[in-house]
Each structure stands twice: as structure tokens, then as C-alpha cells.
């Protein structure tokens, strides 16, 4: 066993095992509160550099939602930010144009006073058009792209929502660079860099809980390569779970897989 894994097992046994997280007073959604508590027990601070959390391993919290996140990875290009169509979105700032994008390609939430979001049903699955005229594809260069096609848009009021310049097919609305950034340093890292910086060092680990919510085991999984990951996107096992909504400048671009898949990657557990 490598010494880094041994050290993580030691930390788990001394700081985590047998404990039920005290998440009172934490102003974060439920799974996030548990995740932050666990990070603190392992001595992990806020990690903005997109590298593995600790000792070459990425920590993944056992989410009660039934799905676990690879990362919050926004697209490198959005239609409301980049030419030739960005001028069609009202607003003088990026966040205002993002709001306009949500109104054009998203849906209103009546429970939120009609606030529009690009999340849920407007977000396409891989290789399938949805009723909002959107489809996600993987291109030959391994970029992931969401296209909009007016002919596939089933909304009754699409002529009112979509400007004439966008009333045709296969319009790119979001693009993630797969393995190469054609603009070099501009518009961020590729998906390959983001994934492998976190998951292709020594691997990843998670901590599981027993029936009363106390942590009982630490489990490890092998490193994950971009080649494996993009194949999982292709098959629909990994999916894009957007949380973009009107009034919030953060795009919330989560890439996830169900917990059952993560569990299948576990190679060894320790109590």
C-alpha cells in the first residue's frame, strides 16, 4: 500500500470514523454541509486550483441525492458571450446577458415567481433532442457541444422567444473544449485538464456511513482518465446537470454520475 493511502486511512480512523457530522449552523444545502464537514476533518481547505484535494487523492462526498459530482465545469464558449450572436442577448454585462439566455433557452419556475432557469428539462441528454430544441453531442475533436435547432423546438411560443437570426438549425449555444484549447490561454482549461488534474493522480476516495449516519469506512477508487470519462459521457452514464438561473451570475455546470456508478469503481475499503 502506498504511504499516501496509509496516511488517509490513519486520518479517517482518528478524525472521522464513528462520528456523525455536526452540520448545525452551516448555511449550505444538505449534501454540501456534510461535504464541508468531511473536508475539515481531513484538513482540506478550499481548493480552487482544480487539483486533487489531498495527498494525490480527490475526496468525493457520499451524496444523499443519489448522484456524485466530478466537477463544476462551465463551458468555454456560450452563445451569449461569444460572437456572432452575443449581441442578440440584452444587457450590458455578462450576467445580464446570461439572464437573457435563460429566458430564451430555459423555462420559468412558477414556484420562484416565474424565474427562468437553464436547468432540468431544457438540458439535453447526449445524442437526443429535447422539446426545447437542444441536443448534446461529442464532436470528432472530443469537444462537447450543445446545439439548438429551431425545427426541433416544440414550444408553442418559440417564434416570440427566439429572434429571427436564431430561427434555424444547429446553432451552437455552449461548447466545452475536450483535449485542446484553440485559443490557448483564453477561456480556460480543457475538460481533459480539469478531469485529470483532479482524478488521474493517485485516484479518489470516499467515506461511507452506517444506518445511523456515522462514518464507518473509507473507500478508494482508481485514477480516472479523460478517455474513460468521455466514453461515459458518450453512453450517458456521466451527464451534464446545469443549475444556471436568472439573477445568479454563476452558471452552476455540474458533471455527474449516479452513486451506483461511483460505487462500481471502488477497489478497496478500510474500517
UniProtKB/Swiss-Prot annotation:
The gene is scrFIR. It comes from the Bacteria. It is an enzyme of class 3 (hydrolase). One of its GO terms (molecular function) is type II site-specific deoxyribonuclease activity. GO terms for biological process: DNA restriction-modification system. This is Type II restriction enzyme ScrFI. The ScrFI restriction system has two different methylases. Its EC number is 3.1.21.4. It catalyses: Endonucleolytic cleavage of DNA to give specific double-stranded fragments with terminal 5'-phosphates. Keywords: Endonuclease, Hydrolase, Nuclease, Restriction system. Signal peptide: none annotated. Disulfide bonds: none annotated.
